[in-house]
A protein has these predicted regions:
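N-terminal extracellular ligand-recognition/capping segment immediately after the signal peptide
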Residues: 30-36, 45-67, 72-79, 92-94
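Right-handed parallel beta-helix/beta-solenoid
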Residues: 15-37, 53, 340
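Ser/Thr-rich, Proline-interspersed low-complexity disordered segments
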Residues: 21-23, 342-352
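Bacterial N-terminal signal peptides that target proteins for export
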Residues: 1-10
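Surface-exposed loop/turn motifs in large extracellular/passenger domains
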Residues: 44, 63-68, 82-91, 99-110, ...
Length: 353
């Protein structure tokens, strides 16, 4: 039932997309008020063109119609909020975060998202579908998460094929909490924690999963760099019949004093399972007394819920190297022929008394 519902949500978005081919075109909108006016007038499949730079007001994009908002090479939208809508966003740059709420179906194509300072690049609170295509880049604001997902009030399907990164200052790459009944995710892109002088951000955080939530991690996940490297992936507090499958590459972040652990699993209960068949590689440490990260750290009774099959486990390494200074020979600055020979004086005769 879980897989069927997720498939229906996915196909709903995909099957409606052909309507875009015969859609009407509105715009271009040069400011947010013009964009809102087009949204109110739009019908299923309409393409809304935007151009230039605009800042959203407190009024969210909300429409019962399936829409495509498409930009030109100069289109920049600030503080965009989409609520209870089905929207395809393409060829636009989104600054100061993208917020999605309610039951929404959103697809990002060739979209670059940058979070405001201290805020996630993309924040989803609700249900529906979120598709992040492979040509998308999402970065969290300073110290903040790249993508934050909280399932509230409906089925949820999330597919990630693009690049996600936590903000500088140790932001996590992606956080999911909570995820419950009929929550399904396919994470096949690249997810990185942000770097920091002290502690790198975690690549992927999965917290508070319940019901029959299902997540497949098939991409490349890595913790951020710092004095202590961030963990590649953390799974904390999962229960019921939650299933997490890892067949991608998970790496702890490199650090000066401590390398990050590749995968940490703790507080697993019920019939929840974490199935590992990919690559888990701990982060390296570069200081002389640095401690590399572990490939897999399972805490307490979570051992009974973690299954390893055909999985490469490799702890990090201490990469400290002594600097063997070599004193160079003096440089010859002139030709041998230019050196004047030393004259040996002749002996002087002395008289004998």
């Amino acid at each position: 039932m879980k897989a069927t519902r997720a498939l229906v949500l996915f196909l709903l978005t995909v099957l409606l997309c052909p309507a875009l081919a015969s859609a009407g075109t509105l715009g271009p909108a040069l400011n947010y008020e013009e964009l809102l006016d087009m949204v109110r007038r739009a019908k299923d499949g309409d393409i809304l063109l935007v151009s230039g730079e605009m800042t959203a007001t407190e009024e969210a994009i909300s429409s019962p119609a399936l829409l495509q908002i498409s930009g030109d090479s100069r289109a920049v939208l600030h503080r965009l909020h989409i609520s209870d809508s089905s929207v395809v966003l393409s060829d636009v740059e989104l600054r100061d975060s993208l917020t999605i709420s309610g039951i929404s179906n959103v697809e990002l194509r060739a979209v670059r998202v940058e979070g405001a300072p201290g805020q996630s690049g993309l924040s989803l609170v609700g249900g529906g579908t979120l598709l992040i295509d492979g040509d998308c880049e999402i970065t969290g604001g300073e110290g903040a998460t790249g993508v934050s997902v909280s399932q509230r009030g409906g089925d949820l399907y999330v597919s990630v094929e693009g690049s996600i990164r936590g903000g500088e200052g140790g932001g996590s790459g992606m956080e999911v909490s909570p995820l419950s009944e009929y929550g399904t995710m396919m994470l096949a892109g690249t997810i990185r924690g942000g770097n920091d002088a002290m502690m790198g951000g975690t690549g992927l955080n999965l917290f508070g999963l319940s019901g029959n939530a299902f997540i497949t991690v098939a991409g490349s996940i890595r913790g951020g760099r710092g004095a202590a490297g961030g963990a590649g992936m953390q799974v904390v507090s999962i229960g019921d019949t939650v299933s997490i499958g890892v067949n991608g590459e998970i790496r702890g972040g490199s650090g000066d004093e401590y390398g990050g652990n590749a995968l940490i699993v703790m507080d697993a209960a019920g019939a929840a399972a974490v199935n590992l068949s990919g690559m888990l590689i701990g982060g390296d440490a570069s200081a002389q007394t640095g401690e590399p990260g572990q490939s897999l750290l399972v805490i307490g009774d979570s051992v009974a819920h973690t299954r390893v099959a055909n999985c490469l486990l490799q702890d990090g390494e201490n990469t400290f190297a002594y600097n063997k200074a070599v004193t160079p020979l003096p440089e010859i600055t002139s030709s041998v022929n230019a050196v004047e020979p030393l004259t040996t004086p002749s002996p002087t005769a002395t008289s004998t008394p």
